Amino acid sequence: MMKPVMLSVYGAENVCASCVNMPTAKDTYEWLEAALKRKYPNQPFEMQYIDIHEPPDNEHAKELAEKIRNDEYFYPLVLVEDKIVGEGNPKLKDVYEEMEKHGYTENR
């Protein structure tokens, strides 16, 4: 069995200024999790939500959170493992493509 990939969704409680009328980062986390479970059933993956104002004690997470706060990236910022696959309004297609590079296959 393959090692489950880690998906990270960086965001904040409030919607980013450039992302008005789009889902919040928490909403993005939830719909992304639901979509991935439907597309890749019985293929485990891990997800984490990272608040950009209180990132975990991890240098990589802190650096990304700071870049988002400094407007270098829009949030929600979505990563598969350590690869950025979407920001602001992430596209499922891009997330799926990266998941499939890690061996995930669509349930048919």
Curated annotation (Swiss-Prot):
InterPro entries: DUF1462 (IPR009190), Thioredoxin-like_sf (IPR036249), YuzD-like_sp (IPR038218). Keywords: Disulfide bond, Redox-active center. It holds the Pfam family DUF1462. Disulfide bonds join C16-C19. This is Putative disulfide oxidoreductase YuzD. The gene is yuzD.
